[in-house]
């Protein structure tokens, strides 16, 4: 019977990252995936590695450390895999959407806020307005989210990890006196020491809606257009963004829909995304819609204690 230090349920970006760094630290890893790696949001996300704009110092430290790991993997992934994550360094222009956001950002970024539309239009001529100002970040990267997820997974496999296709249920785990002992499928049994359920918005459902796992699904839709127009920067405002990716398509998003697991793209979302984009930009008269995607990401459930 095979023995593993860690069972990982789900091979999205979190599961694949965990598999990579665990394997790198000489842990024996078993990954269980129901579909294929990058099946949902981990393979369809915009892939922007944007700066942390909040005020929580611990969250900022975590973000900074994560960004450093991205920079490291960008330089070293070829040591582990042939799957290129396609990191792309570019400039990010974040447009401040409200007076409240500006006040919040002033605490940490006041010195970087620029209110000069003419100056900003020299960088991105197609912008119509900058609302309450912008912050320009030169240290910014985008990545192909599908490739990154598969690059990390493939790296872990090349270091000895194993992946199996299985629709995991919590009943697949066996315990001995409340201590985790093994994981079983219909055909195999594996001895395991630890388990990590990294199934995004499905995590709570898999874990039998455990109250300690307070995640829920949030649907996001995005549009991909062919255009002859140059667009060298990544622009974000509110929850929305526009960026031209390495596939030479203009990616525009996004929605944040609290609709549980209601699947599918909608015309309403398409109109909403385009309206937001057209309010911000001029001179995109040749947009040709190539793709419209919808996927689920996870967000925290807000629990009120009465």
Where are these regions (language model features)?
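Short loop/edge segments at beta-strand edges and connector loops
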Residues: 33, 115, 149, 165-168, ...
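Active-site substrate-recognition segment that forms the wall
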Residues: 14-24, 47, 83-88, 194, ...
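Helix-loop-beta segment of a Rossmann-like dinucleotide-binding subdomain
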Residues: 83-93, 114-159, 255-260
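Glycine-rich FAD pyrophosphate-binding loop
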Residues: 23-43
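A conserved short coil-to-beta-strand element within the FAD-binding core of flavoproteins
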Residues: 163-181
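Beta1/beta-strand and adjacent pyrophosphate-binding region of the FAD-binding site
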Residues: 2-14, 30
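Dinucleotide-binding Rossmann-like beta1-alpha1 core, especially the glycine-rich loop
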Residues: 47-126, 132
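Short hydrophobic core segments
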Residues: 6-9, 183, 190-203
């Amino acid at each position: 019977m095979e023995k593993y230090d860690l069972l990982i349920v789900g091979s999205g970006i979190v599961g694949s990252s965990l598999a990579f760094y665990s394997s790198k630290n000489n842990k024996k890893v078993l990954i269980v995936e129901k579909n294929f790696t990058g099946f949902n949001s981990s393979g369809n996300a915009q892939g922007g590695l944007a700066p942390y704009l909040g005020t929580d110092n611990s969250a900022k430290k975590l973000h900074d450390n994560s960004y450093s790991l991205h920079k490291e993997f960008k330089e070293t992934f070829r040591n582990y895999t042939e799957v290129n994550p396609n990191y792309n360094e570019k400039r990010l222009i974040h447009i401040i959407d409200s007076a409240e956001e500006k006040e919040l950002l002033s605490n940490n970024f006041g010195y970087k806020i620029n209110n000069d539309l003419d100056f900003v239009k020299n960088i991105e001529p197609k912008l119509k307005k900058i609302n309450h100002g912008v912050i320009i970040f030169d240290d910014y990267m985008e990545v192909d989210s599908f490739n990154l997820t598969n690059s990390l997974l493939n790296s872990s496999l090349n270091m000895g990890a194993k992946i199996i296709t299985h629709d995991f249920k919590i009943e697949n785990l066996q315990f001995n006196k409340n201590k985790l002992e093994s994981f079983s499928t219909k055909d195999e049994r594996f001895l395991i020491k630890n388990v990590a359920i990294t199934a995004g918005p499905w995590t709570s459902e898999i874990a039998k809606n455990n109250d300690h796992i307070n995640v829920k699904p949030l649907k996001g839709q995005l549009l991909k257009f062919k255009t002859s127009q140059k667009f060298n920067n990544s622009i974000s405002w509110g929850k929305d963004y526009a960026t031209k990716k390495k596939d030479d398509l203009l990616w525009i998003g996004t929605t944040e829909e609290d609709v549980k697991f209601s699947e599918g793209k909608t015309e309403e979302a398409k109109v909403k995304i385009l309206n937001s984009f057209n309010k911000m930009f001029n001179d995109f008269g040749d947009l040709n819609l190539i793709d419209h995607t919808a996927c689920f990401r996870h967000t925290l459930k807000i629990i009120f204690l009465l």
